[in-house]
Amino acid sequence: MLDGLKMEENFQSAIDTSASFSSLLGRAVSPKSVCEGCQRVILDRFLLRLNDSFWHEQCVQCASCKEPLETTCFYRDKKLYCKYDYEKLFAVKCGGCFEAIAPNEFVMRAQKSVYHLSCFCCCVCERQLQKGDEFVLKEGQLLCKGDYEKERELLSLVSPAASDSGKSDDEESLCKSAHGAGKGTAEEGKDHKRPKRPRTILTTQQRRAFKASFEVSSKPCRKVRETLAAETGLSVRVVQVWFQNQRAKMKKLARRQQQQQQDQQNTQRLSSAQTNGGGSAGMEGIMNPYTALPTPQQLLAIEQSVYSSDPFRQGLTPPQMPGDHMHPYGAEPLFHDLDSDDTSLSNLGDCFLATSEAGPLQSRVGNPIDHLYSMQNSYFTS
């Protein structure tokens, strides 16, 4: 009975001992680590620890040049880099020479761009800008105040429109150096002869690319200009100046064509006016020598005025009164030779026939032949 109890006690103590030992082992053994580089479980005897993450020895290498890292390394976006590649990829670069800027170098800042002291100069006259000088940051290039004003004057001469000669969408306003305190006075350098700007000569392919883009949009955005500059191998500034000159050229041609159309219209109007004026003047010259014929009312007035004193009707034989057959038309001795000579009748007839051709007015008033025959009949019947 005691032996059984001792065995049970020994068995129970053995179980407790094994449980406590397993608990100790569980605390001592750490969970398996995962490599930060390849995301695999680390089964190697030795490992490397970087920024609270575990790495295989073979995974600790530069992500750019694939060289193993032994002493120092740079960590960015869960990747490792050597010093050279890290500075090449992520270090601050100069806005002028696009080279990395060392941490111990002095710099000049213009808005978001950083420059070496030697690179902080005007791109036209290459004069180094000092503290307090006024300048313009245009298309990532620095322009001093004098060269900027000259460029605007040239653009205004080429293109008088305010839209072309004004600032572009990405052109910054006139500003001062970031390190300047107060408004400084820039050196004008009027006596100094500045070197002339090099003239850019476009090739056929570059000109075709520019014209194709100009047909799509005469005023492209900044991204399109940067794309054209990358395709043609030119600077963005050259691309912008070409588009400005092309817009000015098209406007000049449009104004010239409009002026020609106006001149042509004015010439046509003048010619038509001269034609109409000459025709009317010619007709007036033709009609002026001829007087207008009298109207029937005027003819009737003439009849009444001429024969208002005649008591007899027109074309009828006057009444035969005693002693009046010799002078039926008044007391005037118009036919005093009728009895002396018979041939005088024929002469009188010829005279009246000659006078009958005077015109339509006399024929309408009365024919003297009728009066002559009536007088002759009355003479022979009496």
UniProtKB/Swiss-Prot annotation:
GO terms for biological process: axon guidance; cerebellum development; dentate gyrus development; dopaminergic neuron differentiation; locomotory behavior; memory; midbrain dopaminergic neuron differentiation; negative regulation of neuron differentiation. Its main location: nucleus. PROSITE patterns: HOMEOBOX_1 (PS00027), HOMEOBOX_2 (PS50071), LIM_DOMAIN_1 (PS00478), LIM_DOMAIN_2 (PS50023). The keyword Transcription regulation applies. Residues 33-92, 92-154 form the LIM zinc-binding domain. One of its GO terms (cellular component) is chromatin. Isoform 1 is expressed in many tissues. Not found in heart, liver, spleen and testis. Relatively highly expressed in fetal brain. Isoform LMX1A-4AB is expressed in testis. Keywords: Activator, Deafness, Developmental protein, Disease variant, DNA-binding, Homeobox, LIM domain, Metal-binding, Non-syndromic deafness, Nucleus, Repeat, Transcription, Transcription regulation, Zinc. GO terms for molecular function: DNA-binding transcription activator activity, RNA polymerase II-specific; DNA-binding transcription factor activity, RNA polymerase II-specific; metal ion binding; RNA polymerase II transcription regulatory region sequence-specific DNA binding; sequence-specific double-stranded DNA binding. The keyword Magnesium does not apply. Acts as a transcriptional activator by binding to an A/T-rich sequence, the FLAT element, in the insulin gene promoter. Required for development of the roof plate and, in turn, for specification of dorsal cell fates in the CNS and developing vertebrae. This is LIM homeobox transcription factor 1-alpha. It comes from Homo sapiens (Human).
